[in-house]
């Protein structure tokens, strides 16, 4: 039997969402591992690959890491991979106000999972994107920037959407669908 995949996260809500999206049919067990990984700067693909290799070195086995970006088109992709710090300093209201001087409120939610089976292994990336707009905060404020991101074609923010609906359309869902497909192909 294949070893479990260590998902590096300290965020219980993220783990819950990943397990809900992958479902019981996913062929590998996912276990949460909290590691102290360096906070890297750069492009998302590079950040994910380096974080994944460092996590695999520490775990000494199969790992996956996730990095999420919120890219404002008017700001040429910022805050991007630095959304965590923007949110910490500005809160949801501040994220919305960043675009006060811009007509363009469009954004992309981007999720990238990186997987490797060993410290010296190839890192495989699985990326999902959802288009939307940055709006005044609405809905519960218990999961990051969900209150300010309204996906295109919906009149509710991620925070307002029922969890099952969000999990069918989100950037994380799109990335995990690619990851699940990879493991389904691998198990054939």
Curated annotation (Swiss-Prot):
Q: Which residues bind Mg(2+)?
A: 39
A Gene Ontology CC term for this entry? cytoplasm
Membrane-crossing residue ranges in chain numbering: none
How the cofactor is bound: the record states: Binds 1 divalent metal cation per subunit; can use either Mg(2+) or Mn(2+).
Q: Which UniProt keywords apply?
A: Cytoplasm, Hydrolase, Magnesium, Manganese, Metal-binding, Nucleotide metabolism, Nucleotide-binding
Which reaction equations make up its catalytic activity? ITP + H2O = IMP + diphosphate + H(+); dITP + H2O = dIMP + diphosphate + H(+); XTP + H2O = XMP + diphosphate + H(+)
Q: What is its EC number?
A: 3.6.1.66
Broad class of enzyme this protein falls into: hydrolase
| Keyword Hydrolase set for record | yes
User: Could you tell me where this protein is found in the cell?
Assistant: Cytoplasm
Q: Which cofactor does it need?
A: Mg(2+); Mn(2+)
What SUPFAM superfamilies is this protein classified in? ITPase-like
The alphabetized list of GO BP terms reads: deoxyribonucleoside triphosphate catabolic process; nucleoside triphosphate catabolic process; nucleotide metabolic process
Q: Mind listing the GO molecular function terms for this protein?
A: dITP diphosphatase activity; ITP diphosphatase activity; metal ion binding; nucleoside triphosphate diphosphatase activity; nucleotide binding; XTP diphosphatase activity
Residues reported in the UniProt entry to bind ITP: 9-14, 51, 67-68, 84, 143-146, 166, 171-172
- Pfam families for this protein: Ham1p_like
Source superkingdom: Eukaryota
The family annotation for this protein states: Belongs to the HAM1 NTPase family.
What this protein is reported to do is described as: Pyrophosphatase that hydrolyzes non-canonical purine nucleotides such as inosine triphosphate (ITP), deoxyinosine triphosphate (dITP) or xanthosine 5'-triphosphate (XTP) to their respective monophosphate derivatives. The enzyme does not distinguish between the deoxy- and ribose forms. Probably excludes non-canonical purines from RNA and DNA precursor pools, thus preventing their incorporation into RNA and DNA and avoiding chromosomal lesions.
- Oligomer and partners: Homodimer.
**Name the UniProt record assigns to this protein:** Inosine triphosphate pyrophosphatase
**Highest classification ranks of the organism:** Eukaryota, Metazoa, Ecdysozoa, Arthropoda, Hexapoda
């Amino acid at each position: 039997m294949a070893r479990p995949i260590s998902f590096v996260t300290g965020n219980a809500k993220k783990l819950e969402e990943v397990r809900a999206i992958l479902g019981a049919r996913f062929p590998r067990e996912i276990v949460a591992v909290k590691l102290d990984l360096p906070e890297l700067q750069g492009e998302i693909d590079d950040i994910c690959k380096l974080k994944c290799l460092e996590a695999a070195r520490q775990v000494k086995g199969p790992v996956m890491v996730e990095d999420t970006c919120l890219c404002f088109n008017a700001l040429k992709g910022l805050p991007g991979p630095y959304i965590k710090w923007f949110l910490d300093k500005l809160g949801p209201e501040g994220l919305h106000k960043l675009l006060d001087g811009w007509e363009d409120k469009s954004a992309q939610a981007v999720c990238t999972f990186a997987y490797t089976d060993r410290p010296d292994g190839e890192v495989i990336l699985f990326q999902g994107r959802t288009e939307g707009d940055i709006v005044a905060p609405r809905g519960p404020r218990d999961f990051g920037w969900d209150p300010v991101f309204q996906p295109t074609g919906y009149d509710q923010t991620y925070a307002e959407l029922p969890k099952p609906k969000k999990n069918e359309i989100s950037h994380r869902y799109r990335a995990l669908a690619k990851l699940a497909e990879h493991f389904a192909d691998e198990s054939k």
